[in-house]
């Protein structure tokens, strides 16, 4: 076969592959928008009170944090919170650049995260979705958005354990919309010392974060003290650092997050460091 014909065949195959990958990503995007419409359309807006006088039992470092984060604001309109993020994911199978986004309910532990993992910084290798809607979960990851390598498939006990972690995960990101950390039927605060407190899940959900505050009254770390069920049936302990606080629409929030997960032997399993590019309330 002539070289020119061989090149045409190769070019044709590459074109088909690129089209198939594009179709896969578009299909996933459409699925994600349908899920977002299903779980994050709040309907009529309502106002959330930020009056700390309603919470006389807040531990001292927690109260100081809210005073810092709220900057004197007394209320906020409840809307879904959207943000874009970009970072690096270090997995046991390799290192990836991630472009991600998340939408969260403003006052309930519901969120939808989606992201594309790039190999070498340019090849869209993996597409992932993680949706938690309080007592349900829709998670999957696909190579080139076609070949599933992770899905929601747990026995009832493991699923319950996973939901405990996913609820905490929501609150670990809620430092970007701090009114969601006020006490309610889903969680409460318990004192530890002058610089730390526990954020404790309530009701059917079980688990807690040890939360550390700095001298500027910022939350700088939220960590689980024990391993918890994560995606892909892994038991891991999470340490999440919150950095680079900025004033966003009148609230002080961190714009860099650094997560590290450890296995039962306390060996580092995974890292995800990312910067928040945009937050919309």
List each model region and its residues:
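Short, hydrophobic/aromatic-rich segments at coil-to-beta transitions
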Residues: 77-84, 107-114, 191-200, 219-221, ...
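Membrane-interface motif at the C-terminal end of an N-terminal transmembrane signal
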Residues: 17-36
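Buried hydrophobic residues that stabilize the cores of well-folded domains
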Residues: 38, 62, 66, 98-104, ...
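Gly/Pro-enriched, hydrophobic low-complexity segments
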Residues: 195-281
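Flexible, processing/modification-adjacent segments and terminal tails
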Residues: 139-202, 207, 232-233
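N-terminal Sec-pathway targeting helices
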Residues: 1-20
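N-terminal mature ectodomain segment of secretory-pathway/periplasmic proteins
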Residues: 5, 63-149
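N-terminal leader/targeting segments and the immediate start of mature chains
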Residues: 31-81
């Amino acid at each position: 076969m002539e070289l020119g014909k061989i090149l045409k065949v190769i070019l044709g195959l590459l074109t088909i592959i690129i089209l198939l990958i594009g179709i896969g990503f578009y299909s996933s995007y459409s699925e994600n928008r349908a899920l977002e419409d299903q779980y994050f359309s709040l309907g009529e807006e309502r106002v959330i009170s930020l009056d700390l006088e309603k919470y006389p039992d807040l531990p001292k470092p927690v109260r100081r944090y809210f005073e810092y984060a709220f900057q004197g604001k007394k209320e906020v309109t409840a809307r879904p919170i959207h943000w874009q993020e970009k970072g690096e994911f270090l997995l046991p199978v390799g290192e990836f650049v991630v472009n991600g986004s998340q939408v969260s309910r403003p006052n309930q532990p519901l969120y939808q995260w989606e992201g594309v993992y790039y190999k070498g910084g340019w090849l869209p290798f993996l597409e992932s979705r993680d949706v938690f809607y309080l007592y349900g979960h829709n998670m999957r990851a696909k190579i080139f958005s076609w070949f599933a390598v992770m899905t929601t498939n747990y026995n009832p006990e493991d699923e319950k354990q996973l939901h405990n972690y996913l609820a905490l995960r929501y609150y670990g990101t809620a430092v970007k919309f701090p009114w969601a950390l006020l006490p309610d039927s889903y969680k409460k605060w318990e004192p530890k010392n002058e610089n730390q407190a526990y954020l404790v899940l309530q009701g059917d959900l079980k688990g807690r974060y040890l939360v550390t505050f700095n001298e500027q009254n910022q939350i700088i770390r939220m960590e689980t003290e024990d391993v918890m069920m994560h995606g892909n049936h892994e038991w891991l302990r999470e340490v999440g650092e919150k950095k680079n606080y900025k004033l966003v629409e009148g609230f002080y929030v961190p714009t860099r997050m650094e997560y590290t997960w450890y296995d039962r032997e306390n060996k580092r399993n995974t890292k995800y460091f990312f910067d928040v590019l945009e937050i919309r309330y």
